[in-house]
Amino acid sequence: MAFPIINIADLEVGPPDPARAPTGANADNYDIRRVDIAHRIGARKLGYNLTVVAPGKHNCPFHSHRAEEEMFFILEGDGELRYGDTRHPLRAGDVIACPAGGPETAHQIINTGNTEMRYLSLSTMAPIEICEYPDSGKFGVYEDLPDDADGRRVRFRHLARHEDARDYWEGE
């Protein structure tokens, strides 16, 4: 059983996971470094991690969740929150709520400061999720599956655009 307490100061954030490395023309805009906290302390229904973002970068594309709710707590650094059609300055101590919804709740945290930005990310971890990406017109369908034999997370993942839609009866 995992010990239910961990101190953020004791967490080491390593280099980005190569499996999650961004690709494409805008790959240099992203810095994806995070340390899982939830599994280390035995959480089952909430996900949390420590996220670190370099100056001028963001951690993920502008997106919304149809099932999950997220909350972020800014620990260090300055940045900006894109939220729906608005932008808001961020600084240490800010708490951000991102409820489930459509494009009106799409969000992205951008480090606009000169030092690393560190924040705690929390999520309700819905087992089945649909995310929408307004900037690219994509959506993703995700489902958590049982871990593999080595204990690694396995996930169904499919990304598409709405114009890729097929008729329900096509090919049946």
Each PLM stretch: what is its role?
Residues 50-55, 65-82, 122-124:
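Short, conserved beta-strand element in jelly-roll/cupin
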Residues 31-36, 49-65, 100:
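Conserved short histidine dyad/triad with adjacent acidic residue
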Residues 85-101:
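Short acidic-glycine-tyrosine-enriched beta hairpin
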Residues 100-129:
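Ligand-binding loop in jelly-roll beta-barrel domains
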Residues 1-45, 132-172:
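A short, N-terminal "cap"/entry segment at the start of jelly-roll beta-barrel domains
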